[in-house]
Amino acid sequence: RMGMPGLMDILKQIADMWENNRQKILSAGDEITNTIQPRQELNAPVNTVNTETLRKGYGQLKKSFDAKWGGFGAAPKFPTPHHLTFLLRWGKRSAEPFALKMVKKTLTAMRRGGIFDQIGFGFHRYSVDAKWLVPHFEKMLYDQALLAIAYIEAYQATKEKKFAVTAQEIFTYVLRDMTDPNGGFYSAEDADSEGREGGFYVWKRKEIMDHLGEKEGDLFCRFYGISDKGNFEEGFSIPCISLSLEDFAKQEGMEPGKLEKDLMNSRRRIFVLRGKRIHPLKDDKILTAWNGLMIAALSKGYQAMGDKKYADAAVAAADFILAKLRGRDGRLFRRFRHGDVAYPGYLDDYAFLVWGLIELYEATFEVSYLEEAVALNKAMIDIFWDKKGGGLYFTGKGNETLITVSKDAYDGALPSGNSVAALNFLRLGRMTGNVDLEKRAEQLIRSFSGDINVFPMGYTHLLSAVDFIAGPAQEIVIAGDPAHKATKSMIRAVQEKFLPNKVVLLYNDGPEGKRLEALSPFVK
């Protein structure tokens, strides 16, 4: 057609070339493979990754920070919560107030923007504009988990309640809409509804007014920026907040508590109305890696805020993954859907789940979760570790054979498996007294040190591991009966604080204590 060969003609040519020029094709394949392989590491390793690297990473983030709207760089804007969690650590280390200012500005702006579902909660994937107003409306499980962690740590660092409330809202969404009855968490919700991007989430002012009435509807629309003109396509409005509750209450001459209660009641009524729409398609596969992130987030949520339903949900998910997505040989699978388990696990499945199990141990002090973390961490090293150059490959024994194997530490929309693994090594090393794990973390970081030192802003989760190594780190052993009031008070005192470079063990007499001794002999 139009002078171009058809598919059948191309297939015949391929068959002919394979029959008559096989060696030439194989040689070309080898040449391509050899060309690709060296690009896996663009900068040779150097010996130094230290607090100066952290300082450089902070400087790059500061330079790219959007002082007006928060976040980093120009549109489209992704949340990149590991930038924020690194800045919290750097702010604590350096006492640099602007680090915390960037975190607070970004978290506040995102919560007020259209990137956050103001009616049903949870974050959309990214913003197409600089001011967080118009999102790509898809919702991803990993964004909910990583952003919840950022808001929780910001709450621990500042004690500003609004950050805790946002984390609670994220969990409300996940536990309501993204949780399988058996305990795992679903992957995503689509952007489209009824054939229109964002159709489920946007509103006409008349629709709100007809449902809430003149006075209540007008107040709701003005607070959430819903107008006749609209701020989106075709006169629709994406709910967003331009003034804080306190400033809006002052403008309206209202008591903030009364305004908050009225808006909450109106929002609930609109949420019920929205429920009559056709819901976006749910991607109901359960991924080991992303479930690991949500287990970590819920566990940290319980530690910081003390709501037992978060710990219960994390336990249910961890038990589900360990029961359904692990083979008899102890290796993980990647995906579960409607009873079907598929694909050997990749690096991030192991690294992210180990992270979740470490946090779950520190939330519940159930030794079994620390045992599982240690075992899966060992399996991960056996399967993915690069014995020659250090670091972990994304694929390993049992995964599909590729023409090139990827080994990367870049922290993009998600932190990399290597970055998460490095911090896991450090924490498990301190929790169990295994110095070799800490050395392995240093070796991993050194293997990527050339790239890290060139562009540390691209490795902010790995920088959190560097921050841990730089110290000081706290190894806290609480001895006592977990049911005893004094023990509970000590646990709460530790968990409420922002202590990013800590590990916590609970030791008591009895079977649990003996199991902990087997993992961590120094607690005796």
Each predicted region: which residue ranges?
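Glycine-rich, acidic and aromatic/proline-enriched surface loops and short helix-turn segments
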Residues: 109-116, 316-324
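Tandem alpha-helical RNA-recognition repeat domains
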Residues: 88, 92, 152, 156, ...
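Replace the tail clause
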Residues: 1-297, 301-305, 336, 445-524
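Glycine/proline-rich, flexible active-site/cofactor-binding loop segments
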Residues: 84, 103-106, 311-314, 318-321
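Long, polar/charge-rich, low-hydrophobicity segments
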Residues: 176-179, 323, 328-352, 356-517
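Catalytic nucleophile-loop/oxyanion-hole region of alpha/beta-hydrolase
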Residues: 163, 310, 341-344
